[in-house]
C-alpha cells in the first residue's frame, strides 16, 4: 500500500484505454504508452469501438485484458487500475479500483478489495469534489473539462471545477479529466491542475509513445 501511495503521489499522467479488441494490439499499445510516460493505466471498455463491434466485454475477456495491462504496468513501474468492477480488480490483483458516483460505496469496495488497493472516485460538481477530497478515497478526479464521447450526455462543468479543486489546496492527489489533449493541456494547467486523465489523446494517436511523451513532458515542466 505504501509503495502504491508513493507511486500515486508522483503520478501525473493517467490513461484510460479500452481492450482494443478491434485492433488486437493491447499489449503493444500498453507498452508504448507506458514507455512514453504514462503513470497509471486503466481498463475501461464501456462504449468502446470493440464493444460496438463485438458486444460488452465478458468477465473472462476483461480479466485477460487486465492481466496484459497489469503485466505491462509492473514492468514499467506504473499503476494498473480497474474501472467499476471490484470483483475484477480483486481477481486481477489491480493496484487501483476507480469508482463513479453511482458505483459501489467506497466502504463496501474497501471491504471487498482489501486494505492494499488504492481507491479513486469521480466527481462532477463542487459538492462531490469536496466530499471526495475529505473522504476515504485515495485520489479523485474532477470533470469533465470538455464534453467527451466517453461520457455521452454528461454536462461538462468545465475548467471552473478544476479551478475550484486547485483552491482546495488538498494534499490528496487529484486529476482533471474529460476531453484533455496536448492542445488543451495548457488551459488545464493554467486552471491549476497538475495531474490529468486522458483517453483519445493517446488511444487514437498514430504513435502512442510520442503522444504520451509530449503530455508527460508538459506536465513535468509545470510542476
Swiss-Prot record:
Enzyme class: transferase
GO molecular function: magnesium ion binding; thiamine-phosphate diphosphorylase activity
Residues annotated as binding 4-amino-2-methyl-5-(diphosphooxymethyl)pyrimidine: 42-46, 83, 122, 151
UniProt binding sites for 2-[(2R,5Z)-2-carboxy-4-methylthiazol-5(2H)-ylidene]ethyl phosphate: 148-150, 179
Entry keyword set: Magnesium, Metal-binding, Thiamine biosynthesis, Transferase
Catalytic reaction annotation: 2-[(2R,5Z)-2-carboxy-4-methylthiazol-5(2H)-ylidene]ethyl phosphate + 4-amino-2-methyl-5-(diphosphooxymethyl)pyrimidine + 2 H(+) = thiamine phosphate + CO2 + diphosphate; 2-(2-carboxy-4-methylthiazol-5-yl)ethyl phosphate + 4-amino-2-methyl-5-(diphosphooxymethyl)pyrimidine + 2 H(+) = thiamine phosphate + CO2 + diphosphate; 4-methyl-5-(2-phosphooxyethyl)-thiazole + 4-amino-2-methyl-5-(diphosphooxymethyl)pyrimidine + H(+) = thiamine phosphate + diphosphate
Residues in coiled coil: none
Co-factor note (free text): Binds 1 Mg(2+) ion per subunit.
InterPro entries: Aldolase_TIM, ThiamineP_synth_sf, ThiamineP_synth_TenI, TMP_synthase
One GO BP annotation of this record: thiamine biosynthetic process
Positions of Mg(2+) binding: 84, 103
EC code(s) of this entry: 2.5.1.3
Name of a matching Pfam family: TMP-TENI
Cofactor dependence: Mg(2+)
GO cellular component, one term: cytoplasm
Record keyword Cytoplasm present: no
HAMAP family for this protein: TMP_synthase (MF_00097)
Family of the protein in this entry: Belongs to the thiamine-phosphate synthase family.
Identification of the protein by name: Thiamine-phosphate synthase
Organism field: Mycolicibacterium paratuberculosis (strain ATCC BAA-968 / K-10) (Mycobacterium paratuberculosis)
Gene name in the database record: thiE
Amino acid at each position: 500500500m505504501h509503495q502504491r501511495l508513493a507511486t500515486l503521489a508522483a503520478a501525473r499522467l493517467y490513461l484510460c484505454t479500452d481492450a482494443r479488441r478491434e485492433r488486437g494490439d493491447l499489449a503493444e499499445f500498453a507498452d508504448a504508452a507506458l514507455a512514453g510516460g504514462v503513470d497509471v493505466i486503466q481498463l475501461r471498455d464501456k462504449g468502446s469501438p470493440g464493444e460496438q463491434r463485438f458486444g460488452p466485454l465478458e468477465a473472462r475477456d476483461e480479466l485477460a485484458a487486465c492481466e496484459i495491462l497489469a503485466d505491462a504496468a509492473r514492468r514499467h513501474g506504473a499503476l494498473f487500475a480497474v474501472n467499476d468492477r471490484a470483483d475484477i480488480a480483486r481477481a486481477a490483483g489491480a493496484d487501483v479500483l476507480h469508482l463513479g458516483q453511482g458505483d459501489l460505496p467506497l466502504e463496501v469496495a474497501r471491504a471487498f478489495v482489501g486494505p492494499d488497493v488504492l481507491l479513486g472516485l469521480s466527481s462532477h460538481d463542487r459538492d462531490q469534489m469536496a466530499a471526495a477530497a475529505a473522504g476515504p478515497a485515495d485520489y479523485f478526479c474532477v470533470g469533465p473539462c470538455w464534453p467527451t464521447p466517453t461520457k455521452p450526455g454528461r454536462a461538462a462543468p468545465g475548467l471552473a471545477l478544476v479551478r475550484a479543486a486547485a483552491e482546495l489546496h488538498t494534499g490528496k492527489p487529484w486529476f482533471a479529466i474529460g476531453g484533455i489533449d496536448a492542445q488543451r493541456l495548457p488551459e488545464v494547467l493554467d486552471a491549476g491542475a497538475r495531474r490529468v486523465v486522458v483517453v483519445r489523446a493517446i488511444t487514437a494517436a498514430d504513435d502512442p509513445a510520442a503522444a504520451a511523451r509530449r503530455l508527460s513532458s508538459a506536465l513535468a515542466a509545470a510542476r
